[in-house]
């Protein structure tokens, strides 16, 4: 009995001897292993650890509010938790809303206007993953090619609805080959430009035949390995969430642009993302709406597929607030290709 007591006292003493700094270092070590982080030198690692620790405190503070029911989503130490926020935005967010407006003014090229079907009652919730119309979550890496992933996702869904086969399409094909249409590879682009390129090009290659590299490369499109094509695209009326809901329900996954410029988006983990600071015109990131619904608390949301891998958000997805005055501009620039 005395031996057991001594052992317990020793364990307590050891626990008390572990400093907060030791715990942070252990958490940092686990984080690096989990996300396969490697840094150029010790100076960079110290810099990244400092950012990680600052984000760690921000996340803990925010998640206390979540536990108290004051916010509707949680944050987490994902693979971007060691990046400065401005560094993250410059690297990951590649949608150029200003370019979209300029191109429309200069060229007059717009898609067909979406007209919702008459006398159709849409379901209260939709998830196109359940119908087999959505490929697995992909990862754009450190390349501002979000627009390409949003484009392929929408066309993958439309091709599935028409042909009954889900084919993963090549984002790299769009990155390398659609510059003449106003896209800039890893430096950003537009989904509508991608749809125009695919139409004029006679198709887009499969991901298998033209795999993703995450860099700007020369175009090596091969018409022998085309996976899908489109005949144009449809623009959903700007800011109209109800029409976008009908489009998602009746037509399939929809390409959208959003304001993802906030730290809360960078570190999002789970729940319904409700960010009052979002701007409906400051659009900087292309994603894919694959459904919609209402959570247990009665909060409406859009089900959104991102292109940052499965370790971000809810296995690569985010639920974004719906019917909150077009929050984050989710219905400002929405479209889908026609096939």
From Swiss-Prot:
In the UniProt record, which residues carry a glycan? 96
Catalysed reactions listed for this entry: Specificity close to that of papain. As compared to cathepsin B, cathepsin L exhibits higher activity toward protein substrates, but has little activity on Z-Arg-Arg-NHMec, and no peptidyl-dipeptidase activity
Catalytic residues as annotated in Swiss-Prot or TrEMBL: 146, 285, 306
Q: Which EC main class describes this enzyme?
A: hydrolase
Q: Where in the cell is it found?
A: Lysosome
Q: Which InterPro entries match?
A: Papain-like_cys_pep_sf (IPR038765), Pept_asp_AS (IPR025661), Pept_cys_AS (IPR000169), Pept_his_AS (IPR025660), Peptidase_C1A (IPR013128), Peptidase_C1A_C (IPR000668), Peptidase_C1A_papain-like (IPR039417), Prot_inhib_I29 (IPR013201)
Membrane-crossing ranges are: none
Q: Which UniProt keywords apply?
A: Developmental protein, Differentiation, Disulfide bond, Glycoprotein, Hydrolase, Lysosome, Protease, Signal, Thiol protease, Zymogen
**What is a GO molecular function of this protein?**
cysteine-type endopeptidase activity
User: Which pairs of Cys residues are joined through disulfide bonds in the record?
Assistant: 143-186, 177-219, 278-328
Signal sequence, renumbered to the chain: 1-17
Q: Which domain of life is it from?
A: Eukaryota
Q: Which residues form the propeptide?
A: 18-121, 295-298
Tagged with keyword Transferase: no
| GO CC annotations on file | lysosome
The UniProt record lists the EC number as 3.4.22.15
Gene Ontology BP term (one): cell differentiation
Subunit details? Dimer of a heavy and a light chain linked by disulfide bonds.
Q: Which family does it belong to?
A: Belongs to the peptidase C1 family.
Function of the molecule:
Important for the overall degradation of proteins in lysosomes. Required for differentiation of imaginal disks.
**Name under which the protein is recorded:** Cathepsin L
The scientific name of the source species is Sarcophaga peregrina
Q: What is the lineage of its organism?
A: Eukaryota, Metazoa, Ecdysozoa, Arthropoda, Hexapoda
């Amino acid at each position: 009995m005395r031996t057991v007591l001594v052992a317990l006292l020793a364990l307590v003493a050891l626990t008390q001897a572990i400093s907060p700094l030791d715990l942070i270092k252990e958490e940092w070590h686990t984080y690096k292993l989990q996300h396969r982080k490697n840094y150029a030198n010790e100076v960079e690692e110290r810099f990244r650890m400092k950012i990680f620790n600052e984000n760690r405190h921000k996340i803990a503070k925010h998640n206390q509010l979540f536990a108290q029911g004051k916010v509707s989503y949680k944050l987490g130490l994902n693979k971007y938790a060691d990046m400065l926020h401005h560094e993250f935005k410059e690297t990951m967010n590649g949608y150029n809303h200003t370019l979209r407006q300029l191109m429309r003014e200069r060229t007059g090229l717009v898609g067909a206007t979406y007209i919702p079907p008459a006398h159709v009652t849409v379901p209260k919730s939709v998830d196109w993953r359940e119908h087999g119309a959505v490929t697995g979550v992909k990862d754009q890496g450190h390349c501002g090619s979000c627009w390409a992933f949003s484009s392929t996702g929408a066309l993958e869904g439309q091709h599935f609805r028409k042909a009954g086969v889900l084919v993963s399409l090549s984002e790299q094909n769009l990155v390398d080959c659609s510059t003449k249409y106003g896209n800039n590879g890893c430096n950003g682009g537009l989904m509508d430009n991608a749809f125009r390129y695919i139409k004029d090009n006679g198709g887009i290659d499969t991901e298998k035949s033209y795999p993703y590299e995450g860099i700007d490369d020369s175009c090596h499109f091969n018409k022998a390995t085309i996976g899908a094509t489109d005949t144009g695209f449809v623009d959903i009326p700007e800011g109209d969430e109800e029409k976008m809901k009908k489009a998602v329900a009746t037509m399939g996954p929809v390409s959208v642009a959003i304001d993802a410029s906030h730290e809360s988006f960078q570190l999002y983990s789970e729940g319904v993302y409700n960010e009052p600071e979002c701007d409906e015109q400051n659009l900087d990131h292309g994603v894919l709406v694959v459904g919609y619904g209402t959570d247990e608390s009665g909060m409406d949301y859009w089900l959104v597929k991102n292109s940052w891998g499965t370790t971000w958000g809810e296995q690569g997805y985010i639920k974004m607030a719906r019917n909150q005055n077009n929050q984050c501009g989710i219905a400002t620039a929405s479209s889908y290709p026609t096939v």
